[in-house]
């Protein structure tokens, strides 16, 4: 029986399931129920997080997983429920080298991102900048990952603004599909710390032959660029190579 077409499922926010042949890789499992955590401090939007529940059918989406990637340890990427899920030890986990000790303290036996294949999938770690200047330094290291499957090269960029590290990853790996953490996350001080709607549109127009999938919106209080804001900007910029999935939506890479 031939393998199903490769696909990327947005669970919620930055939580993804990459369906690549026999592998099903979860990225950044944020699994807390709505309102379980306080709002991100220093944001103009005070609502508790997550802003929305997991989508209907989320439990089924998280069945049959073969591996996990944790791009960094901020709570909107690995929360208490997500850590408990990974600590069950049912699947291998890869994370940033800087995070391995903390993951171990949470009962998660992880290896460095890119140190080994994820099952049958080659994976390489990429860098990024979680903002600009001193604020990015304070927020700490972030990573992305490039996975290869058949003719697809999938770049999960992680929590980065457009930066030298991001542009280098596009140049070196020439991905066919890029997942961008959008939302224009921002605090009361400094510049946005994830991709803004304008950045997504500009990047897409700079790379017209690449498919971009924008996630990281409408679920966490400091992500102020909503899906509606992004879609309006993409229409204004005539950027037609960006998909903006809803929670629970599967994007087939054909």
Name what the model sees in each region.
Residues 1-3, 89, 94-152, 232-254:
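Metallo-beta-lactamase
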Residues 4, 10-23, 117-176, 195-198:
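Catalytic core of the metallo-beta-lactamase
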Residues 7-10, 47-56, 77, 158-160, ...:
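Short gly/ser/thr-rich secondary-structure transition/capping motifs
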Residues 23-69, 80-84, 133-135, 162-172:
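Pre-active-site segment of Zn-dependent metallo-hydrolases
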Residues 27-30, 64-76, 94-96, 155-160, ...:
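Active-site neighborhood of phospho(di)ester-bond hydrolases with catalytic His/Asp-centered motifs
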Residues 32-34, 74-78, 100-102, 116-119, ...:
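Active-site environment of divalent metal-dependent phosphoester hydrolases
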Residues 79-89, 222-230:
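Metal-dependent catalytic neighborhoods of phosphoester/phosphodiester hydrolases
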Residues 161-247:
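Cap/insert and terminal regions of metallo-dependent hydrolase folds
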């Amino acid at each position: 029986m031939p393998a199903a077409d490769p696909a990327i499922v947005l669970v919620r926010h930055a939580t993804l399931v990459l369906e690549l042949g026999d592998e099903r890789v979860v990225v950044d499992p944020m699994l807390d129920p709505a309102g379980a955590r306080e709002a991100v401090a220093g944001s103009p939007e005070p609502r508790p997080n997550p802003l929305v529940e997991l989508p209907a059918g989320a439990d089924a989406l998280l069945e049959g997983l073969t591996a996990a990637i944790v791009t960094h340890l901020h709570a909107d990427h690995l929360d208490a429920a997500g850590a408990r899920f990974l600590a069950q030890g049912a699947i291998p986990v890869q994370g940033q080298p800087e995070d391995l000790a903390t993951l171990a303290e949470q009962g998660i036996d992880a290896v460095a991102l890119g140190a080994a294949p994820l099952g049958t999938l080659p994976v390489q770690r990429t860098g990024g900048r979680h903002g600009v200047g001193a604020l990015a330094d304070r927020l700490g290291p972030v990573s992305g990952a490039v996975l290869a499957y058949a003719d697809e090269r999938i770049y999960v960029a992680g929590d980065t603004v457009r930066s030298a590290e991001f542009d280098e990853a596009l140049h070196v790996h020439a991905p066919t599909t890029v997942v961008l953490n959008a939302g224009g996350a921002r605090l009361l001080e400094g510049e946005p710390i994830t991709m803004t709607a304008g950045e997504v549109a500009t990047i897409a127009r700079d790379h017209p032959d690449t498919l971009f999938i924008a996630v990281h919106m409408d679920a966490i209080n400091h992500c102020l660029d909503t899906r509606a804001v992004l879609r309006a900007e993409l229409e204004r910029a005539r950027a037609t190579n960006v998909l903006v999935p809803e929670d629970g939506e599967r994007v087939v890479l054909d």
